[in-house]
C-alpha cells in the first residue's frame, strides 16, 4: 500500500493557512507587513510610518493583527473595537455592518482597522486576518488605497500569523541591536523565504529601532544579505508620544523630533521609490551564536 504526500503549498515543510485568492488585496497598492520580536516597537514603527506615508499624500490603511488591538491607538488616540468582536455581535453576518462599525479615521486621514484575534488557546490568527481583508473588500474599502500596512503580533511565524505575508509586497523587520532581537529576525527571514516560493512577498529590509549603535545588526545583514532601511535611536520623544497616544508627527518639533520625523519620511519615500527585493539567507541557530553570541 502506498501513499502520496502532496507538495506543501506555502514552502517546503510548512503547513500554513492558505488564503482564498478571491480575498487578495488589489494590485496597485503597496502592501507592507511589519514583523519583529515582541515588544520591539512594531506598533510605534507602523503607526509613524503610516503617518509618514500620509504626509507624502498617500491614502493609507493600517491593519493591526494582534489580539491586544493596540496597533493604531496613537493614530486614533483611542482603543478601537476589533473586527472579530464586531462580527461576533452580528453573528458573523457581515452584510449587516457599515464601514464605520470597524474602520476608523486617524491622524492625517490614515484609516485604521484592528483585526483582533481569537481567545487565548483557541482559533487561528490567520483566519482573523483573512476575515478582515474579506470584510474590507466586501465594502470596497481597498480600491482607492495607496498603502496598506499590516502590524503583526510579536515574532510568531506560524501559519496563522504568517498570513499577512500572503498579501504583502514587502516585509519590514523591526529589530534592536541585540542578540535576542536578531535571533527573532532570523526566524522571520526563514518564514518569508518559505512564503516567497509561492507568493509575491519579498524582504524589504530592516528597521533598527531603539538602538544607539547598529554594529550587531550590520554583522547579521552582511552575512544574510539584508539591508537597514532606517535607524531610530533611543529617543525619549518616541516613548513620550506613546504615552500621549499620538504619533511622532504630533509632538513638539524639537531637534530630536524633527530628526525622527525626517527618518520616517525617508523610509516611506524609499519604500515607494527605492526599495529593492532582498533574497535573505537565514542562518542556522548555531551560526547566529557563533556570529553574535560569543567572542
From Swiss-Prot:
EC top class named in words: oxidoreductase
Family matches, as PROSITE patterns: NIFH_FRXC_1, NIFH_FRXC_2, NIFH_FRXC_3
Complex formation: Homodimer. Protochlorophyllide reductase is composed of three subunits; ChlL, ChlN and ChlB.
EC number(s) on file: 1.3.7.7
Domain of life according to the entry: Bacteria
Cofactor note: Binds 1 [4Fe-4S] cluster per dimer.
Gene field: chlL
GO biological process: light-independent chlorophyll biosynthetic process; photosynthesis, dark reaction
Name of the molecule in the record: Light-independent protochlorophyllide reductase iron-sulfur ATP-binding protein
An example Gene Ontology molecular-function term: 4 iron, 4 sulfur cluster binding
Role description: Component of the dark-operative protochlorophyllide reductase (DPOR) that uses Mg-ATP and reduced ferredoxin to reduce ring D of protochlorophyllide (Pchlide) to form chlorophyllide a (Chlide). This reaction is light-independent. The L component serves as a unique electron donor to the NB-component of the complex, and binds Mg-ATP.
Binding positions ([4Fe-4S] cluster): 124, 158
Family from the record: Belongs to the NifH/BchL/ChlL family.
